[in-house]
């Protein structure tokens, strides 16, 4: 396989990029944006080498702890649990939450072989106890897997003195947090509901 074909194939690993889109990107870079293409390659290499997960919340960072976990001005008694770093970014862009985060890196899905340990629920419980969290906001996209995950988290924390709430309605069923506008996220956070199981 030649360099052109390898690059087209490599770009297809991105979500929503099929063979035609990948080919258009490659031709555009080669014909009009060679310097930017080299810059893109350099940025990708640096990101893949240096970005890892925050030891406390699992968000992306180049350090041991991410900037959100290091920030002393954030409310350390309030913890927002999300599925992915993209959800952290979406909530931060809404400017409606000043607490800390915990990124599950997925949700419980037996069909995909993901159980409570695979998404970090024991680490979540340890964090809640260690940091004396008073409220956990479950900000998971509405789906069957999310409801299963919410149930497991509630069971995991049933003996702890912590309030558990989840985002209010307004987030469409099957919708992903990262694609919602800031007003919808802000409204869902403000109108979150306590979970009674």
From Swiss-Prot:
Sections of the chain in a coiled coil: none
Annotated zinc fingers (C4-type), start-end: 54-69
Any one Pfam family match given in the protein's UniProt record, by short name: RecR_C
Q: Where is the signal peptide?
A: none
Say if the entry is tagged with keyword DNA repair: yes
InterPro entries xref list: DNA_Rcmb_RecR, Rcmb_RecR, Rcmb_RecR_Znf, TOPRIM_dom, TOPRIM_RecR
MF terms from GO for this chain are:
DNA binding; zinc ion binding
SUPFAM superfamilies assigned to the protein according to its UniProt record, in alphabetical order: Recombination protein RecR
Q: What SMART domains is this protein classified in? A: TOPRIM (SM00493)
Q: Which UniProt keywords apply?
A: DNA damage, DNA recombination, DNA repair, Metal-binding, Zinc, Zinc-finger
Q: Which Gene3D superfamilies match?
A: 3.40.1360.10, RecR Domain 1
A single BP term in Gene Ontology: DNA repair
Transmembrane parts of this sequence:
none
Every Toprim domain range: 77-172
Q: What does this protein do?
A: May play a role in DNA repair. It seems to be involved in an RecBC-independent recombinational process of DNA repair. It may act with RecF and RecO.
Q: Which family does it belong to?
A: Belongs to the RecR family.
Name of the protein in its database record: Recombination protein RecR
Q: What's the encoding gene here?
A: recR
């Amino acid at each position: 396989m030649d360099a052109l074909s390898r690059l087209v194939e490599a770009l297809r690993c991105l979500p929503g990029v099929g063979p035609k889109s990948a080919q258009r990107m490659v031709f555009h870079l080669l014909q009009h944006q060679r310097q930017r293409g080299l810059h893109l390659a350099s940025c990708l290499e640096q990101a893949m080498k240096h970005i890892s997960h925050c030891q406390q919340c699992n968000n992306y960072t180049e350090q041991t702890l991410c900037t959100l976990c290091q920030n002393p001005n954030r409310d350390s008694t309030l913890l927002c649990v999300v599925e992915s770093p993209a959800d952290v970014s979406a909530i931060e862009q809404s400017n409606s939450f000043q607490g800390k985060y915990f990124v599950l890196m997925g949700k419980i899905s037996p069909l995909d072989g993901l159980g409570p340990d695979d998404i970090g629920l024991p680490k979540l419980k340890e964090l809640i106890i260690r940091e004396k969290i008073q409220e956990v906001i479950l900000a998971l996209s509405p789906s069957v897997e999310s409801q299963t995950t919410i149930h497991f988290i509630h069971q995991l924390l049933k003996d702890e003195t912590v309030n558990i709430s989840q985002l209010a309605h307004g987030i469409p069923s099957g919708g992903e947090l990262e694609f919602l506008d800031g007003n919808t996220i802000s409204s869902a956070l403000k109108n979150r509901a306590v979970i009674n199981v």
